Amino acid sequence: MSCLDVMYQVYGPPQPYFAAAYTPYHQKLAYYSKMQEAQECNASPSSSGSGSSSFSSQTPASIKEEEGSPEKERPPEAEYINSRCVLFTYFQGDISSVVDEHFSRALSQPSSYSPSCTSSKAPRSSGPWRDCSFPMSQRSFPASFWNSAYQAPVPPPLGSPLATAHSELPFAAADPYSPAALHGHLHQGATEPWHHAHPHHAHPHHPYALGGALGAQAAPYPRPAAVHEVYAPHFDPRYGPLLMPAASGRPARLATAPAPAPGSPPCELSGKGEPAGAAWAGPGGPFASPSGDVAQGLGLSVDSARRYSLCGASLLS
């Protein structure tokens, strides 16, 4: 057994938890064993002992030098994350200061852009940007590039005095797509027969508050009528609620039928022998009322309704 075998004994199979810790030592042991085999093959048996002794005397010095290296003096910082992950930090120092120094040095250097990278057909100017002598810190970057907490200014609302002044400009009315022209399309006027104003809000059809000055702008095109305006009860005074011509000169309600005689049959409508369909076929029919109340067109008294229910079979037959 040589001195190497005494100093560096062969270990068993590495365990899974200690494999990373003993890997360098196993590599060193394999390297030394190969060196010893090469010396034994090349040297004579008499000189093999002196060679091995000289090699063994040099080995502890090299190991001490490796142990005294700065890497051994500064072990990595281990941070336990979970049962399967451990974070080792080999960097020593303040990370934030190193990162700031790196970026400040990179921004102070000239740009790496070269005009030779572009095609020869592209026009080239003699400005500092093309000359690659313009540092990045002096370029016109937006404020959000240098300050991450920068907030853009909020634009003024549409109902503010700035928006009102913008609508009063001479070119505002000439543009058909300007907010003033669009607002004028929606507020054309109350002279049209289908235009009506809702009493519960001042601007019935415009969802945006663009200010009072925008409503005064004129528009060359009429706005389309909404569905609820076409079918509104105030569609046209010439038509009734059922879009039928209004009948003039007729009573709003049917006259109450007189009470029958005590000896008359229950199905008799009146003492004069009035036919059953006279109340429906007359000018005061239920579907000719000009007013918006349908119940007025069906002006039947309680007695007439009771008679119709009693003799409904004879009337419908």
From Swiss-Prot:
Quaternary structure note: Interacts with TEFs. Binds to TEAD1/TEF1.
InterPro entries from the UniProt entry: Vg_fam (IPR011520)
KW Nucleus (keyword) present: yes
Amino acid composition bias (Basic residues), ranges on this chain: 196-206
Name of a matching Pfam family: Vg_Tdu
Compositional bias annotation for Low complexity: 44-57, 108-120, 272-292
Single GO cellular component term: cytoplasm
GO molecular function: transcription coactivator activity
The organism's taxonomic lineage, starting at the top: Eukaryota, Metazoa, Chordata, Craniata, Vertebrata
Biased segments, Basic and acidic residues type: 63-76
Region (Disordered): 41-76, 108-128, 191-214, 253-293
Family assignment from sequence similarity: Belongs to the vestigial family.
Tissue expression per record: Skeletal muscle.
Alphabetical UniProt keywords: Nucleus, Transcription, Transcription regulation
Gene Ontology biological-process entries: positive regulation of transcription by RNA polymerase II; regulation of transcription by RNA polymerase II; skeletal muscle tissue development
Source organism per UniProt: Homo sapiens
Domain of life: Eukaryota
Protein name: Transcription cofactor vestigial-like protein 2
Compartmental location: Nucleus
Gene symbol of the encoding locus: VGLL2
Protein task: May act as a specific coactivator for the mammalian TEFs. May play a role in the development of skeletal muscles.
